[in-house]
């Protein structure tokens, strides 16, 4: 893989930390995709959804407060329909439910090992 900022152990710890923070704010249909062997973009994609913009904001804010690392980049926070928190090795996608159903991002990575969570 390309310029990794964490070790595999650190990445998996960050994933669990993000999952815990997202579920604290009732993220729905949370999915962790292990894309390490499929792309150089990241080791993991975390995808979750929420029904309202305030809930999306709460999930994103809780992840940002509850993780030891700051995201390298944030995209979509102004509109709160699809927010990307880029932790380099871990990409977090927080969707409004309708947006997630429309884009079906997880279908693009259907062959990735996955783990599902729900609050």
Predicted regions and their residues:
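Polybasic/polar functional segments that serve as interface/processing modules
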Residues: 1-42, 50-87, 97-101, 108-119
């Amino acid at each position: 893989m390309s310029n990794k900022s964490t070790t595999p152990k650190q990445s998996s710890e960050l994933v669990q930390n993000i999952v815990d923070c997202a579920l604290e704010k009732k993220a729905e249909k949370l999915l962790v995709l292990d894309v390490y062997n499929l792309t150089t973009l990241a080791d993991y994609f975390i995808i979750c959804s929420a029904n309202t913009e305030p809930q999306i904001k709460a999930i994103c804010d809780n992840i940002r407060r509850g993780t030891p690392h700051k995201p390298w980049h944030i995209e979509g926070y102004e509109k709160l329909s699809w927010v990307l928190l880029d932790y380099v090795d871990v990409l977090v996608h927080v969707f409004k439910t309708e947006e997630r159903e429309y884009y079906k991002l997880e279908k693009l990575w259907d062959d990735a090992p996955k783990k599902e969570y729900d609050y």
